[in-house]
Amino acid sequence: MIKKNNESWLIVGLGNPGKEYERTRHNAGFRAIDVLADRLGCKIDRLKFQGLYSQVNYEGKKVFLLKPQTFMNLSGRSILQLSAYFNIPPQRIIVLFDDISLPPGRLRIRADGSAGGHNGIKSIIAEIGSQAFPRIKIGVGAKPHPEQDLADWVLSSFSSKEEKDLCSALNRSAEAALCIIDHGVPEAANRFNGSTP
């Protein structure tokens, strides 16, 4: 039983469910985990834990991929349910999400930290009671005008140039998630932080 727990990981992509949100900045996490699922040859299509999830074996480890279906601000509920059910500690919950402080195409990997104003991360910290989970931040670009509403910005689409840069970042974020499992956060951060399209 203990061995199984030692080999279980949860990788989460944050976003909002629904066609109208699919290509928005706030859904970079959903898109990143779809890229990862393709790479691992699985589909994230099992409905449970207030989310869509998949289970796959990777390098002898049990890996769960999750897309919470709660809408962004309640993402933590879905993550808490799955991680509690399968007994996965925060240190083995990797979260992929959008970051407006990074330009499109850039990644930043951290072992832990505060929510930094991101409501999805805020929800996770509140629900699981810990900040000590690895995260992969995917750059989606800052608001072009300071007075622009943040919600409007994160729910906007990418320009074609930004989309191209984002696609590169999505591929690298999938690699980075597996690198964290294989080699740990410091190695993944060293390899992918600051990498450009």
Residue ranges and their predicted role:
Residues 1-112, 122-137, 143-151, 156, ...:
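Nucleotide and nucleotide-moiety/phosphate-recognizing core
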Residues 117-120:
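Hydrophobic alpha-helical segments within soluble ligand-binding/sensing domains
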